[in-house]
């Protein structure tokens, strides 16, 4: 992650003289995808974690030397157990979050992907389950609105191709 200079980097102990130090800010990038298949309609692979009730799209951070596309394919394959290939780029979600005193400015690159093999029972342990859901059900189930927006865009792209 690339570090953005903060007040502590410049020797100042507070932001704007308010007496409170500014949190460190770091940039973060990840990549993943909306994996689809055509069954009796469009189905989307989503990942669930029972410990916190989160349902999301598969994604993760780049390994050294990886392109964003390589990261997306690797992370989606690991988290879903599926072999996938990229069809098209859907878009980028940008957001901020804080963890352990650090503010992160994150960009998540999402790709439309189709499955070429594999089995969801072979997913890694980041999520408890991976399920194929009809697109409408996936939209209702996903925890984060920004991921549902990516699924909406993916559906439009799939419908334009079929």
Name each region found by the language model.
Residues 1-34, 38:
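Acidic, metal-coordinating catalytic segment for phosphate/diphosphate chemistry
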Residues 62-149:
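Unchanged
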């Amino acid at each position: 992650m690339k570090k953005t200079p903060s007040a502590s980097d410049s020797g100042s102990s507070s932001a704007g003289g308010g007496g409170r130090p500014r949190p460190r800010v770091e940039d973060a990038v990840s990549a993943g995808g909306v994996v689809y298949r055509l069954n009796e309609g469009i189905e989307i692979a989503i990942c669930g974690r029972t410990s916190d009730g989160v349902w999301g799209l598969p994604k993760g951070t780049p390994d050294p030397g990886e392109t964003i596309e390589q990261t997306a394919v690797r992370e989606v394959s690991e988290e879903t157990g599926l072999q996938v290939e990229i069809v098209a780029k859907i878009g980028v979600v940008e957001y901020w979050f804080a963890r352990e005193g650090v503010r992160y400015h994150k960009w998540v690159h999402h790709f439309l992907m189709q499955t070429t093999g594999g089995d969801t029972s072979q997913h890694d342990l980041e999520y408890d389950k991976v399920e194929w859901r009809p697109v409408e059900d996936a939209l209702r189930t996903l925890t984060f609105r920004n991921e549902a927006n990516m699924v909406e865009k993916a559906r439009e792209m799939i419908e334009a191709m079929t």
